[in-house]
Swiss-Prot record:
GO molecular function term, any single one: acid phosphatase activity
Catalytic machinery residues: 75, 338
Family assignment from sequence similarity: Belongs to the histidine acid phosphatase family.
Name of the gene this protein is made from: PHO11
Signal peptide per UniProt: 1-17
Record PTM: Glycosylated during secretion across the membrane.
Record InterPro entries: Acid_Pase_AS, His_Pase_clade-2, His_PPase_superfam, Histidine_acid_Pase_euk
Induction info: S.cerevisiae has 2 types of acid phosphatase: one is constitutive and the other is repressible by inorganic phosphate.
Protein name: Acid phosphatase PHO11
Length: 467
């Protein structure tokens, strides 16, 4: 009911959408000026490099030779999901029907403001040059993927110089598929690339990039009792401040929370968002930690199912590493969702699982997990296998930064010696059982991830889903 009502509201506001210019001249001075808040948007905003790079060079250590590269990437910048858009449009309706003159932080709404969701067909979808609110927007998912492709060629181009035909893998989410295709486009026309579209339906079982979708035991509300302890009074403070500046507006804590999503997704679509300017720095910090907390306990180390779910992809990754000498394909590129990447990183052990996050306060000294550092829109996790003299090593590069394995980083470039890595990986997956923990057999007969090995005969081409 709400969905229909909100869509009706939006439709009415879009009657003259065809006459709306793609941005205004005044936008030029604002676009690209809000990068400092990206780390506080919980991964909903544009891509940025991992801040904790430890000063380690991204370059291949001297006198070493790359043997294999794997990448698991998140789709690029997008419009909000349908469910998130409901909240944003409900709050927009409240603002658009305010009869007074806006004052204070909301005064920009007096200046012929154009709501950034101009067509509901864009919900769930990648932002592109065609659907962006402003043609000058530098943060579209389309351009991010193409930049990523150019960065890939600069860093690893020699790995595909003599391999003109290879596969790229994506979940059958429309936005993931679009990201993969834009990435392929960014590589240029030198390569003959086969895009394999892998189902993320629960019936895919283990043969998927999105194992949590194949997990009937997955609980979206797990650990809510912990999360409810987090102090969210700052949200009512935002609402009260804006209401005081604008008598009769009657914003709620829910509206205040929605403004953070509005801020992030408007930047994705427009290149900047005046809504972002309503927050104090303290409020951004409190919101950001709330996102860290929710992620840690619902898609990260704080949820005991996650390590088994992430093992589905991690086991396949380790198998590819072991077969690097016999596999013709030396580069393995995949695109999926943030949840899948977080599950994967949890199993690897890159995300600290020894110290649970507290909901009692913001732990500035002890908090080593920041959701947006790992999974901004367009996130990418690279696994590098390289040989130096007679020894071989593995290391991870997350969003442009080398992130060492804490207990295995004595190799060149803070890498992990290959046999030590295999021992480490075995310990990480010990006790995990994706099929059993998730009760996969109740929804699928597929018990193994095989698409990396059988794509050339099966030719995966699942129907795209708008999610």
């Amino acid at each position: 009911m709400l969905k229909s009502a909100v869509y009706s509201i939006l439709a009415a506001s879009l009657v003259n959408a065809g006459t709306i210019p793609l941005g205004k001249l005044s936008d030029i001075d604002k676009i690209g000026t809000q990068t400092e808040i990206f780390p506080f948007l919980g991964g909903s905003g544009p891509y940025y490099s991992f801040p904790g790079d430890y000063g380690i060079s991204r370059d291949l250590p001297e006198s070493c030779e790359m043997k294999q590269v794997q990448m698991v990437g998140r789709h690029g910048e997008r419009y909000p999901t349908v469910s998130k858009a409901k909240s944003i449009m409900t709050t927009w309706y409240k603002l658009s029907n305010y009869t007074g003159q806006f004052s204070g932080a909301l005064s920009f709404l007096n200046d012929d403001y154009e709501f950034f969701i101009r067509d509901t067909k864009n919900l769930e979808m990648e932002t592109t040059l065609a659907n962006s609110v402003n043609v000058l927007n530098p943060y579209t998912g389309e351009m991010n993927a193409k930049r990523h492709a150019r960065d890939f060629l600069a860093q690893y181009g020699y790995m595909v110089e003599n391999q003109t035909s290879f596969a790229v893998f994506t979940s059958n989410s429309n936005r993931c598929h679009d990201t993969a295709q834009y990435f392929i486009d960014g590589l240029g026309d030198k390569f003959n690339i086969s895009l394999q579209t892998i189902s993320e339906a629960e019936s895919a079982g283990a043969n998927t990039l999105s194992a949590h979708h194949s997990c009937p035991a997955w609980d979206d509300d797990v650990n809510d009792d912990i999360l409810k302890k987090y102090d969210t009074k700052y949200l009512s403070g935002i609402a009260k401040r804006l209401n005081k500046e604008n008598k009769g507006l009657n914003l709620t804590s829910s509206d205040a929370n929605t403004f953070f999503a509005w801020c992030a997704y408007e930047i994705n679509a427009r290149g900047y968002s005046d809504i972002c300017n309503i927050f104090t720095k303290d409020e951004l910090v409190r919101f950001s930690y709330g996102q860290d907390l929710e992620t840690y306990y619902q898609t990260g180390p704080g949820y005991d199912v996650v390590r088994s779910v992430g093992a589905n992809l991690f086991n396949a990754s380790v198998k590819l590493l072991k077969e690097s000498e016999v596999q013709d394909q030396k580069v393995w590129l995949s695109f999926t969702h943030d949840t899948d990447i977080l599950n994967y990183l949890t199993t690897i052990g890159i995300i600290d699982d020894k110290n649970n996050l507290t909901a009692e306060h913001v732990p500035f000294m002890e908090n080593t997990f920041h959701r947006s550092w790992y999974v901004p829109q367009g996130a990418r996790v690279y696994t590098e296998k390289f040989q130096c003299s007679n020894d071989t090593y593995v290391r991870y590069v997350i969003n442009d930064a080398v992130v060492p394995i804490e207990t295995c980083s004595t190799g060149p470039g803070f890498s992990c010696e290959i046999n030590d890595f295999y021992d480490y990986a075995e310990k990480r997956v010990a006790g995990t059982d994706f099929l059993k923990v998730c009760n996969v057999s109740s929804v699928s007969n597929s018990t193994e991830l095989t698409f990396f090995w059988d794509w050339n005969t099966k030719h995966y081409n699942d129907t795209l889903l708008k999610q």
